[in-house]
Each structure stands twice: as C-alpha cells, then as structure tokens.
From Swiss-Prot:
Subcellular location: Cytoplasm
Provenance organism: Xanthomonas oryzae pv. oryzae (strain KACC10331 / KXO85)
Main localization (coarse): cytoplasm
Protein name as annotated: Cysteine--tRNA ligase
Metal-binding among keywords: yes
Length: 476
C-alpha cells in the first residue's frame, strides 16, 4: 500500500491527506506567465516546484491532467505592443517561446495542456453570461463586473474580511461600479487596442476570468489542485473562486490550494516593480541550468527563498560532487565490464519526503546521504577492493543515486556533459587532447611540459583532478 500523500491546503491552512476525486485521472492547474517580457527567476520557482509535484502525481496515480495557462491578453502586453508599434501576437508569441525554452532548460516538463486566453474568448464570454444570468455579475458602460457582495464566501481563501476590503478600496472608485470591491470580467476596447465582439460591445476579458474559463474548459468545474505563487492568493485566486463557484452552481472550484513562497534578493521580494530581478534567460546563460533548479528546490516551497550568487555557487559545487560520484561509480563498473543498464529506482526515503508536502530539502539531504554511501564504497574498492566481485553493490548504489535525482529532475545528464558545460564539441576535444598530452608528458618525465599544460588549462578555467581512474577535468 503506498504511503499517504499529504499536502498543505491553503484553503484550510492545514496539511491534509490528498486523494483525487478520480484516482485514475487527478487534475492540476497552475497559473502560468503573462508573456510580455522575460520571466525572472522568481517566476520559475512555481513551475519547478510543481513540476516535481506533477511527476509525483504521475508516479502515484499513473496519470495526470495538468494545465498551465498562458496569459496572452493583458494591459501590460498591450502597453508593450503599443510602445513597439506591433500587434500583441508579436510580443506574446516571442515571449511565450522564450518562456518555454527557459523552462525546458530548467528541466521543467511541459504541461499536458497549455491553454492561451485568446483562444478561449467564446468560453470566457459564455461564463460571463452565466454569471449575469445567476445574478452574480452586471453590465455597466461597456464593462461587466462581478458583484462581490453576491458571494457570501468571498475571502475564504485569503481570510480577508469583505467589509474591511471594501473599506480599504481606492477612494476614486469607477462610477460604473455598484460597490468598490467589484472587479472587472469584461472591459471595452478602443480601436487601437485588441478586442473581440461580445454582447456588451467590442472588448477584452479581465485577467481573473481567463483562468476560471480555461480551467473549466479543460479540467471541469472542480479541480483537485490549483497552484501558484503566494502573491496570487489575493486578489487573483480569491476572484477565481468567486467566479467559478458562482458560475457552476456552488460547486467547489479547487479542493486543494498550493502556494509557493517568494524569492528575496538582498532582503526584498524579487519583482519587476522593484527593479531587483534576475531573468531566467540571463541566468541560464551564466550558470548551469541544473544548478538553478537545485537552488530553487533547496528550501521548502512554502517558505521564502533568499536568492544570491552564493546560493547558485553552492548548488553548482554540490552538483559537481554528485556528478563526480556518478562518474567514478561508472568508471568502476566499466572496470568490471558489466555492460548492464542501470535501472533507476526512486528510494523510499526520497518518495516519503516528497509525499510529506513536497519536502524537497529533506529529499536533497537523502541524496547527499546516498552519495556519501556511494563514495565510501568507491574508496573501499579503489584502495584494495575488487570491483568485479561487488558489481551488484555498485549497480545498486548508482541506481539509488540516479533514482533519487530523477524524483527531483536532477542528475540525469551524462557526467561528462555536466563537467564539460560551457564548451562546444570541438573545444571538448581540444581540452581532452591537452589532458592526454599532459599525461603522456608526465609518463615521459617531461614535467615542464606537463606543468605548462596544467597552467594553460587553469588559465582557461579548466580544473584537472588526478584520480585512480585517470585524469578528470571540469569547468571551474
């Protein structure tokens, strides 16, 4: 019997056992990007964390319907398109493609469904019409607004009191609103802005209704898990609940709500508005993408994460050690001439950590323990052991380490590829040739030439390591 999967449900503020409505087809919806610019590294935390969750759900239930949307109509997109004098699709197509490339570099598996708002205008209009028919929305001056007072449970996710929210609303409330807290479902578009025909005139949808309509279109009126950044909890997720439950006769919109914490940079939340962002696109050009993924998983997903160059360096050094261990184990297995493919099995300790509300720090500590076990075995065999006599142990510990990494989307590269990062194939061959020349020079006792080659490589940022299995090299 599999262990219980327990997740922190922000709706109840408790860690609870999770069982999907349909165990043969769990559903997961994650709020995706608004594609008007490069994603910053804080935007990547959710996709990476919930990528681990999606993989866990697939292992546990054998299937998953996972949707992550693309917001491709928005006032920020409109502003960017107007500034450049191009259609919004020029902006959105470009940055959606870059986003997908950046997420792929971080090892994020694409969702099963990636709905775009502009492809769901009929569903959005239909949901708005249903809300009007149900008495939860009203048309005014070309706008359609959701009536917050019509939904008694408004505020149940964020635990905000509706009266206090209304008291704190802006003083200059739009005159077409019945109440200050009412929010836009549809807004009119001028000729220079993108728009679609609707019963209320030419216009475009509000942000919140887009997610409600897309989630319902692809996953149904009730989904098992809705996830996103904690900054979206209010008003976005609160408004999604109100719209969806009022449109579907009170049916629960999402049974579990998961929110990842924010990234901090020098003590402040990382955000475009504060100007303290680092984009994923820039970071993957400077650092190993796998190290960025490791760093994003190094703290529990619900906690804030202090982002720094030191964190990236620490993650890179840790992966150096782990890949070095895998490389040494593979070399020892080669000595035994086994030729047997390693079967990756996820250790129960790692699976248990992830089943406990995605405890990735604990899972990473288990990986470190397995690597220590592997290095101890390696040292024992190097210093007097016989690899061929203990091939089953070598297989088992390497499979365990690879399986542990697999659960987190780590350690799946060939170690040679990891250590040759930042070089192309021709450069790899050149460096390998120099390493071989140095070994030959040492054998011939031409130590001056050997030292000169080591210095040349060091100047290029190449570190050499003499091991019982031969000379290894890696980028510093």
């Amino acid at each position: 019997m599999p262990m219980s999967l327990r997740l922190h449900n922000n709706l109840t503020r408790r860690v609870e056992p999770f069982t999907p409505l349909d165990p043969s087809s769990p559903t997961l919806y994650v709020c995706g990007p608004t594609v008007y610019n490069y994603a910053h590294i804080g935007n990547a935390r959710g996709p990476v964390v919930f990528d681990v969750l999606a993989a866990l759900l697939r292992r546990r239930y054998g299937a998953l319907r996972y949707a992550r949307n693309i917001t491709d109509v928005d006032d920020k997109i409109n502003a960017a398109a107007q500034a450049q004098g191009v259609p919004i699709s020029t902006i959105t197509d470009r940055f959606a493609a870059i986003y997908r490339q950046d997420m792929a570099a971080l090892g994020v598996v694409p969702p099963d469904i990636e709905p775009e708002a502009t492809a769901h205008i009929p569903q959005i209009v239909a949901m708005i019409e249903q809300l009007i028919a149900n008495g939860h929305a009203y048309a005014a001056e070309g706008h359609v607004l959701f009536s917050v007072s019509s939904f008694e449970d408004y505020g149940k996710l964020s635990r905000r009191d509706p009266d206090e929210m209304l008291a704190g609303a802006r003083v200059d409330v739009a005159p077409y609103k019945r109440d200050p807290g009412d929010f836009v479902l549809w807004k009119p578009s001028s000729d220079e802005l993108p728009g679609w025909e609707s019963p209320w005139g030419r216009g475009r949808p509000g942000w919140h209704i887009e997610c409600s309509a897309m989630a319902a279109a692809h996953l149904g009126p009730t989904i098992d898990i809705h996830a996103g950044g904690v900054d979206l909890q209010f008003p976005h997720h609160e408004n999604e609940i109100a719209q969806s439950e009022c449109a579907h006769g009170g049916a629960t919109f999402a049974r579990f709500w998961l929110h990842n914490g924010m990234l901090n940079f020098s003590g402040a939340k990382m955000s475009k508005s504060l100007g303290n962002i680092e984009t994923v696109h820039d970071l993957i050009a400077k650092h190993p993408p796998e190290a960025l993924r490791y760093a994003l998983l190094s703290a529990h997903y619900r906690q804030p994460l202090d982002w720094s160059d030191g964190l990236i360096e620490q993650a890179t050094n840790t992966l150096d050690r782990l890949y070095g261990t895998l490389r040494d184990l593979a070399a020892l297995e080669a000595c035994g001439s086994s030729g047997v493919e390693v079967s990756k099995t996820i250790p129960v300790e790692v699976e248990s950590a992830l089943q406990d509300d995605l405890n990735t720090p604990l899972a990473l500590s288990v990986i470190a323990s397995i690597a220590s076990e592997a290095r101890a075995l390696r040292n024992e065999l190097v210093h007097g052991g016989e690899p061929s006599a203990r091939m089953s142990e070598l297989h088992a510990v390497r499979a365990k380490l690879l399986g542990a990494g697999l659960a987190l989307g780590l350690l799946q590269q060939d170690p040679a590829a990891w250590f040759s990062r930042g070089t192309d194939a021709d450069d790899d061959a050149r460096i390998t040739a120099l390493v071989q020349e140095r070994s030959a020079a040492k054998k011939a006792k031409d130590f001056a030439r050997a030292d000169a080659i080591r210095k040349q490589l060091a100047d290029e940022g190449i570190v050499l390591e003499d091991t019982p299995q031969g000379v290894r090299w890696k980028r510093a």
